[in-house]
Design a protein with these regions (language model features):
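Catalytic-core regions of glycoside hydrolase
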Residues: 172, 192-196, 206, 211, ...
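Bacterial N-terminal signal peptides that target proteins for export
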Residues: 1-7
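Boundary of Sec targeting at the N-terminus
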Residues: 20-22
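C-terminal non-catalytic alpha-helical accessory regions
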Residues: 440, 444-445, 454-694, 698, ...
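Feature activates predominantly on carbohydrate-active enzymes
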Residues: 24-26, 32, 38-41, 45, ...
Length: 725
């Protein structure tokens, strides 16, 4: 036999490996859903590293003992103690046991042998770390960018993967949002025609939600159902509503509220029935604003008490509560903040917390820097404007403030700036802060509609592309002292030692959207889309940010200086303090960081790994966008100086900077065109002068914006001094 020596060698090597494989017994001292999940995760990691699992403790090399919870450790805390051949993992509760087990799993996956495993302890910094997940059915906004996730989000395999990601990153709550969730979950006993599905279809929906809540419970993840208000199903309106004029069949947001008794009764009974039929659902949420026009803040609170709060009471069990702080102090759905509304809301929250069927603390939620928290860690505003101190003084005892960190700024490009997250957490370390929501309203992290067809990649779902985003936020909310080495090690585990520089590269390059959003003031979702360098234009359409708009737009961060204010001050022989980030300073920061990021990834060989190719490419895209912005800022300063002073060299300098900005934009296009599809984008759904159907066909890609980038050069070439106009 020609290959007999080779076969014998293979058998000898195989026997040697097997004989050296160490055996492990995993012991659950107090079996539960959570300990079973922890044991399964440990088992998977161990077998992947060629450890042999045993069902009995006799003659094994190692015993991993999952100890019963020890409340003295505190909620969600854990201890890993290694004594010789026994590793004991103890949690302050079931959640802590899972976290301790996952910390060991992480070591195993990173190649740490059980012999080298170190004892450790960890406890949570913030008790509430939630994902805001907008479901793709009966969505708040309407776009192909949301509808395309429908099938993915009806697949329990997707939810298993998403919940695994959540618990691995220490997120402990999943909040599910849509306009009117009830009729996807129940057939209301007294309003059966409100549900649009037949029995088989409804059973499929119910099976989905029960699976989500069951899997979340296994992972010690709380679940919240957060409907918008006041909405009913179209089928309810047609069958039962006695006032057809108030029928909101298309679920418009900014209309008068239907405060009829039948709608109150229907909503209340739906809440009760959902809580009774889904015992693993942890809590509910209140949102005050949409379809509540014509109502005062007090009337909105009263409606909530008569429906959702009373529905919770009638369910006959304890329920947790998220009370989203209202953003309108007027009878309009889009109002402004006020001290009076804050006082009214605080009183309502504290009265809810006193109810025996509500499990405290109540999470009182606010949007951090409106819809674009990926800007500055400094709190400048909330939805509706200024935040007063009513919710904080005196210090609340029955509720905690949670901050919603919205991401409406980057969906395609990967992101990761650990020091930004740490700074955010450090800025919100007050005793009244309970935690964070993290999520979007214009994006659902389900189907990957970005990646062009090609050779295989390591991800199936969109959120898996953004693993660093979730890992940074989740782990640093749990423990902000988690070192960068943890995140760098994940790059190395995935792609090998050459990827060890990627965390630093991302930290530098993906600071670009943070700096743009700090320098370019915004309000709601569509007002800024950082990865596209897009925002509201003068007509309130979403378009590429022109050099004129970059010049005149106020800044968000009070330490930043706009182009207009900078030129006005400098031409008047004024100056700025060292703490101020002027356009030239910002341009230099962008140039320095983005050039260094490009240098860090220049030598990484991606030819044999398409997934690594995308990771490196996104660093390059962010870096080139940052360099584009740096040139554009310098061009804007020169152009505005020319307009103010009439100095011709300033005009020529502006043209040269804007031409350089175009070259960097062309680099972005060259990188992204073969990698990314033309993408649907919710931000384009309400462009004025077009029908919804026309807007829904619009697609985003950097290549599509090139003509607008060229227009900046033409604008500079045709510019005239202000005095000559």
């Amino acid at each position: 036999m020609k290959n007999k020596p080779l076969l014998l060698l293979f058998l000898v090597v195989g026997l040697t490996v097997d004989s050296l494989a160490q055996s492990v017994f995993i012991q659950q001292t107090q079996p539960s859903r959570q300990s079973a999940y922890a044991a399964q995760q440990l088992a998977s990691a161990l077998t992947a590293k060629r450890y042999v699992l045993r069902s009995k403790s006799q003659s094994v090399d190692y015993t991993i003992r999952l100890e019963q919870p020890n409340s003295q450790l505190g909620p969600e805390a854990y201890a890993v103690d290694k004594q010789n051949k026994q590793i004991t993992i103890t949690g302050g509760d079931g959640r802590g046991l899972i976290y301790g087990s996952l910390s060991v799993v992480e070591d195993i996956q990173n190649g740490v042998a059980l012999a080298q495993l170190k004892s450790r302890r960890e406890q949570p910094h913030l008790p509430f770390r939630a994902i805001k997940f907008d479901l793709p059915w009966d969505t708040y906004r309407h776009s192909d960018a949301l509808d395309l996730h429908y099938d993915t989000c009806r697949d329990t395999l997707y939810w298993k993967a998403f919940l695994d990601m959540m618990v691995a990153n220490r997120f402990n709550a999943l909040s599910l949002w849509n306009l009117h969730p009830y009729t996807f979950m129940i057939r209301p006993t007294n309003f059966p025609a409100a549900t649009p599905f037949n029995d088989q279809q409804l059973a499929e929906w119910q099976s989905l939600f029960r699976a989500i809540f069951r899997m979340a419970n296994e992972r010690a993840i709380d679940t919240y159902l957060i409907p918008f208000n006041i909405f009913t199903s179209p089928e309810f309106s047609k069958a039962y509503n006695v006032n057809p004029k108030l029928n909101n069949l298309d679920h418009h947001h900014f209309i008068d509220g239907d405060t009829s008794e039948i709608v109150k009764r229907y909503t209340r009974e739906c809440v009760t029935q959902v809580l009774q039929e889904y015992p693993e659902l942890t809590g509910f949420g209140l949102t005050l604003g949409e379809a509540m026009g014509g109502m005062t803040p007090q009337q909105r609170e009263n409606w909530m008490k008569a429906t959702i709060i009373d529905g919770m009471r009638l369910a006959g069990r304890k329920t947790k509560l998220v009370h989203r702080i209202p953003f309108s102090s007027t009878t309009g759905s889009l109002g402004v903040t006020s001290i009076d509304t804050e006082k009214l809301t605080r009183k309502s929250i504290e009265s809810e917390a006193a109810l025996p069927f509500i499990e405290g603390p109540i999470w009182a939620d606010l949007k951090y820097n409106w819809s674009h928290a990926h800007s500055t860690p400094t709190l400048v505003k909330v939805h509706g404007g200024k935040l007063f101190d009513t919710y904080f003084k005196p210090d609340p005892t029955t509720y905690k403030i949670t901050w919603t960190v919205r991401n409406e700024d980057f969906f395609c490009l990967r992101w990761g700036v650990p020091d930004f997250v740490r700074a955010h957490v450090a800025a919100n370390n007050q005793s009244y802060v309970g935690g964070y929501f993290l999520g979007s309203e214009t994006y659902i992290p389900a189907k990957d509609y970005f990646t062009t067809p090609g050779s295989p990649v390591d991800w199936r779902y969109a959120f898996e592309r953004q693993w660093l985003f979730y890992k940074l936020w989740g782990r640093l909310l749990y423990n902000p002292t988690t070192p960068d080495a943890v995140f760098s090690a994940e790059f190395v585990r995935r792609y090998g030692s050459s990827a060890s520089r990627l965390l630093e590269a991302y930290s530098l390059a993906s600071s670009t959207p943070l700096r743009l959003a700090s320098a370019f003031d915004f309000t709601w979702d569509f007002s800024l889309y950082s990865e596209g360098m897009m925002g509201f234009d003068a007509n309130k359409n979403v378009s590429y940010i022109s050099v004129n708009q970059l010049t005149t737009q106020p800044t968000l961060d009070p330490n930043y200086v706009s182009v207009n204010d900078y030129v006005k001050t400098i031409t008047a022989s004024g100056s700025f303090g060292k703490e101020k980030i002027t356009p030239p300073v910002l341009a230099k920061m962008l140039e320095t960081d983005c050039q260094k990021a490009l240098q860090l990834v220049r030598s990484i060989n991606t030819s044999a790994n398409r997934s690594l190719l995308y990771e490196v490419a996104d660093v390059k895209v962010w870096a080139n966008l940052g360099l584009h912005l740096a040139e554009k800022l310098q061009g804007a300063v020169a152009l505005q100086t020319y307009r103010t002073t009439g100095q011709e060299p300033q005009k020529q300098e502006a043209i040269q900077h804007l031409k350089a900005a175009l070259r960097y934009w062309d680099d972005v296009v060259a990188i992204t065109r073969p990698l990314y599809n033309d993408m649907p984008l919710v931000h384009l759904a309400e462009q004025k002068g077009h029908t919804w159907e026309e807007n829904n066909k619009l697609r985003f890609h950097w290549a599509k914006l090139r003509p607008a980038v060229v227009k900046d050069i033409e604008l500079a070439e045709n510019a005239q001094p202000i005095s000559a106009k």
